[in-house]
């Protein structure tokens, strides 16, 4: 079972270098956002937003709003800096304990799903955040083996 306290400690430790070590594939991200129907006027819930790696992508698509949530205080701090002066609101907290009643057009879980201890519960909670016709998008840019190797290396730095 994944311990949320360990997840917080790990990502707090990694936060300062996260963006410089991030490997982005813009074409893949564009496809993910296209498939999720993220576009003009859309209200997005960005779950486990990290340092805000998708913020610029949302802004390019002229979304109406983004509510970004991360459980790591250090990740959320960096994300808040990136969000200043935009329609992005960053919340530091456990998304499973927050209440958003059917407000969002899209709920995006990018590069984070394996870090949640109860995936079924998470999906149930996130489904309740969506308006009728809204989309829950769960995507990861790396395989499980690559994710584990990446995190093992990051933890040892």
Please annotate each region the language model reported.
Residues 108:
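A conserved beta-strand element that flanks and buttresses the S-adenosyl-L-methionine
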């Amino acid at each position: 079972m994944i311990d949320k306290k360990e997840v917080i400690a790990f990502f707090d430790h990694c936060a300062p270098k996260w963006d410089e070590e991030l490997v982005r594939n813009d074409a893949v991200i564009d496809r993910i956002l296209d498939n999720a129907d993220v576009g003009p006027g859309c209200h997005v819930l960005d779950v486990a937003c990290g340092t805000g790696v998708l913020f610029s992508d949302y802004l390019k698509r002229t979304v109406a709003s983004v509510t970004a949530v991360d459980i790591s205080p250090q990740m959320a701090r960096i994300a808040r800096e990136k969000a200043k002066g935009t329609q992005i609101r960053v919340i530091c907290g456990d998304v499973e304990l927050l209440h958003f009643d059917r407000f969002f057009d899209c709920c995006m879980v990018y590069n984070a799903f394996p870090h949640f201890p109860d995936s079924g519960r998470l999906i149930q909670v996130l489904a309740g955040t969506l308006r009728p016709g809204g989309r829950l998008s769960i995507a990861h840019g790396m395989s499980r083996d690559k994710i584990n190797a990446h995190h093992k290396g990051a933890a040892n730095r």
